[in-house]
Structure formats: structure tokens, C-alpha cells
Amino acid sequence: MLVRRLMSPQGPRCFARCPGNLWSSGVLRPASPFRSRLVRQPLYHAVRSFSKDEKPTPKPTAAGLPQLWHLLRPERRRLQLALAALCASSSVNLSYPYLMGRLVDMFGEGQEGLLFVMDHTALCGLLVVAGGAATFCRLYLIETAIERIAFRLRQQFFKALVERPIAFFDQNKTGELVNRLGNDITMTSRVLIDASAGIRGSITAAVGTCMIFQLVPREMILGLLSPVLALFVTGVLYGRLVRRIAERRQQRLAEAVQRAEERLGGIRTVRTFNAEARELRGFEGLLDLVYQAGWQNALASAGLSCFFVTGGGLFLLHIIYNCGVMVSSGVVSVGTTVSLAMYCLMAGSSYTGVMAAYGDIQKCLGSLQKVLDILGTAEVRPALSQSVAAASGAASAPLAVKFENVSFFYPARPQANVLQGLNLDIPAGARVAILGRSGSGKSTIALLLAGLYAPTEGKIWVDGHDMVAEDRTAWVRSQLGVISQEPTLFAMSIKENVEYGLSPDPVDQASNDLKVKEAAAAAHVTEFTDGLPHGMDTLAGERGQALSGGQKQRVCIARALARTPRMLIFDEATSALDLRSERAVHEALQEVLSSQNCSCLVITHRMSSLQWCDHVAVVEEGAVVQYGQKEEVLQNPCTALQSILRNDEF
């Protein structure tokens, strides 16, 4: 109980009773390097309250064992060989104390004893070499199996992530998913090392204990082994406490790293708002929590090590004393005493190793449970080729789209309907502009059409087929070219970003190069790449940060055009461009649209974007309140459109 109170975040109970409560005042409590200046900050208290709402670490259950066996099964040949090597090395180690006892008994036996010692010394040397070779084989086989398991796990886990619906990423933090892809899978794959250590320790402990029973008179066994039982029980209880504190420290460290990753990813926003000091205070607040948990972990770990070192030393003295008594009484020989002492030490250390391996296996199963939470709920999606084969209609014809009584709410906000009974008909080849206030649901229409979300009610018809019911979302996406208001580029060259949506088959590379060249020229990407030293091979940087906002948007437009889509979706696509670039892109898009004969959906706030549209739909509170030819709508605007024009919200 004293140790439990000492490890608690509130501190020891005995200190709480001291005059003036020295623990809470900070006199006896270890001072954090940040506490003195953070406790006065409101952000610090917010961080403290946030840390209390910690997510519990998934407890390992027996349900994870079948999945663990499924992961290990492809490596069963390696594991069988590793188990054989483990048994060989354990046999060598267990025979060593017996041979050493025989050698000691032959000391002082004259010429015959000397020959015996020489022969058995050579035999012991050969056994040591054989044991080392067996250990090498065991570790090599296990380590290679670990790498193969980690490879498959990461491959399956990443596949499961990229196939999850977008709503999953709205409800889960990217940092946590990346941590599972890295640390949790690494810890899960290390279960083989822990299991082999546990098996080896169990074999050594069991055989060592049996040898002790054989060497020691029965009336002395209880007195010799009773300290082992006491050390074992105490070590198990204390070890659980240490693991719980270590898990708390890891969780708080993960929170700090996640915050740092998020803020460094948005460093431009931090710098724009001069928020460096604010972020430093917030990060130091989280580090303070890590420090407190780390101090508790250090104290508990040091106590556990002290316990085992002290207990092991006392146990060794206990063995020496009892062996001395037995030798003096003539019960056993000196050689038998040496063997007995070595077996006792091996059994004691093996029990300790088994406890440590058991705790590590529990951690591995806990990490495995986190990974299985994703793998076990991964959606099975049909291959794109099957969807394309099932689709009908000419590949070159524009898409016809119809929204029929569509309602939708985001999974993260189920209480707020974004679309309510929306009806919208986009004929094949039409160029429809969607107007509306911010938050009216304009961009949600594009997200639903791209299949990133499924409507909660209603149907979306594409070329006369129910996109959701007939599972044509993947095929529909292959027919779309989407340019969003937030351009997203990857950390690769501009050319690779433009050809991202094209076939990766090397056979199509020549055709891809031609499409990239034409799309880059149409989107005016070549206007700025021609002046760069590496041209289209220039790296875009992480998230495209090496390019300006307008340049990123033009690359995104080229990426959409390179697919020769049957429908183009512009969601504020030119909002990041200056007037000159916007005019040039509009002219290029007008040429592309007239030559490609594709449908077009334009979500915009700018009147200039309406010049190449022939239909206008006005969206208000998640529903289309006016729809028709552009000239008719602008000449007879509804109340919602009048309000938009009056407030100059274009």
C-alpha cells in the first residue's frame, strides 16, 4: 500500500499529513523545470484537465491469441528451427552446472583426477561453442521472422487505412494512426523475442528446480526454495505497478509528440499569428506531465531493480549458508554444492526472466489489439477493374448526374443535417454552377458525388445507375477530375504530382508523358516551371510548400485535366489565383471543356467563374432553392440569391 501511494500522482499519503502539506507545496515533491512558470498559465491548467481524460490502454484479451497465431503461421518453419535451437542452447546451459560440479569433485584426486578434469574441460569448451552457435541461430531466425511479420503487418495495416471511409479519418487523429503503423506494429512483432525468452526461462527454471530436488535432501528443500517463492510473488505485484506507470508515461509522451507533429505541420500558421510563445508554453505543459510520469517511472524502476539486486544477493547468501551447512554435515560433496548453487541461481534468474517476458507479452498483445481494431473492421472493396467492367456507356461521353431527395450529415456531427432533401439534375455535357452562402452545403455536394461520403437518405444517379446501391463509387471517381479549394500536393516532383491519377503501368508511360505535357500547358503550369532549373522535375516539397498557393492550384488543375475526365468538379478552384492567372486558367479551361466535351460542376463565390457555365443552382440550408439556365436565374434571382448579391458575397 505504501508503494502504491508513493506511485500515485497525488504523492505519498504520509506527506499529506505533514504540517503545511509539504508534498503539495512542492518542498518534498521533485520540481519540474517548467512547473514554476507554467502553473500560472491558463493553458497549463487546460492541459492538466485534458490529461485527466486519458484513453485507457486496450487490455490484452484471449481473443487476440488466434490472430497472433495467424500472424505467426507463415513463419512456422523458421520458428520451428528457432525452437530447436532454443532447446539446444537450453540443454547446453543446463548441463553446464552438472559438469562443473563433477570437475570440482575431481580436484585433488591425483593423476586420474587431472585427466578427468582435462577431458571434461575440453567437453565444456565444446558445449560452450555449441551453445553460442545455437544462440546465434535462434536469434537470427527470430529476428528475420520479426522483420517479415512487421512487413506484412504494416502492408495490411496501411491497406486497411487507405480503404477506410473518409468518416473514419474525421473521427481518428492521424498521429495516433501513424503511431500504430510504427510503434505498435514494432512492439507487436517483438512478441517472438519475448516469447522465446519466456520459453527459455521456463525450461531453465523447470529443469533447474528438478535438479535441485534431485541434489538436495528432501527435508531441506522447503527452507532452500521458500525465498524464491517470496521473491516471485513480490516481484509480480511490483512489476505490474511498474508497467502501469510506464504505460502512463508512454501515453503522455504520445500526446506531447502528437501536439508537436500537428504544430510543426502548420508552422506557417503558427508563425503568421506570432504564436511561438503560446505553442512553447503548451508543449512545455505537456512535457511537464511527461516529466512527472517519468519521475514516477524512474523511482519505480529503480525500486524494482533494487529489489531484485538486494533479493538476489540475499538469496545467494542464503544458498551459500545452506550449502556450507550441508557440506559441514557431510550431506553433500563440494562439487554437488557448486552444481546446486549454480542451479539455484539459474532458476531464480529464470523466474525473473519469465516474469519480465510475461509482462512484455502482455504489452505486445495490447499493441496487437490496437492494430486489430483497424484490421478487423477494414472494409472489403471491389477491385476497380470489376467496377469498370460492370459499367455501361461510352467512356468518352459526358456524365449525367442526378441527386434525388438527398440528405446528409457528417458522422462527426450527426445532429446537424448539411443537406436536406436536395434535388439536382446535371444533364450530360452541362456546365452547372452552384451558388450559396458559406455553410449552405455546396462543397458537400462535390464530396458525395466523389464517393467520399454516402448520403444518409436519397439516391445519387450517375448515367442512370444508383452510385451507392450498385457500388459504383470507385468507377465514378475514375471518371471525375476534382479540383478542391484546398490544393493538396505530395512530396514528389511536379511532374509526378500531375501524373498521380494516371496508370502506373510502365507500358503507359509514353502516353502518360504526353497527357502530362498537354495538361500542364492547359493549366499554365509550364509558365512557371520553364523558369525553374529542373523544370517539371522540381520537387514540390512537403504538402507542396515549395510552391506558392497559385502554383499549387495550377498543378492540381493539371492533375485533374491529365485524366481526361468525363466530368470536372471545381470547388473554388481558382480562389488562390490572382486575376491574371485566373483569367488565363479560365480561357484554358474554356478550350479544354469545348474540346473534351465533358460535364462540369463549378462551386464558386466569384461571378467571373460563371462565364463558362450554362446552368446555375442556388443552394440554401442544404437544398436547391433555384435552378435553371444562367440567364434566367440571374435575371430573376430568388430571395437567397438576392441576399448573396446584395451582401456582395461572391
Regions found by a protein language model. Give the residues of each.
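Hydrophobic alpha-helical transmembrane segments of ABC transporter permease domains
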Residues: 96, 134, 146, 182-226, ...
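Juxtamembrane loop-to-helix connectors within ABC transporter transmembrane domains
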Residues: 72, 142, 146, 160-207, ...
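Loop segments that connect adjacent transmembrane helices in multi-pass transporters
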Residues: 172-175, 245-296
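Membrane-integrated ABC transporters
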Residues: 1-96, 106-124, 138-142, 146, ...
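ABC-type nucleotide-binding domain
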Residues: 392-650
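Transmembrane helices of ABC transporter permease
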Residues: 81-87, 197-248, 321-332
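Cytosolic ends of transmembrane helices, especially the final helix of ABC transmembrane type-1 domains
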Residues: 252, 272-275, 299, 347-376
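Hydrophobic alpha-helical segments in the permease module
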Residues: 124-135, 227-230, 301-316, 334-356, ...
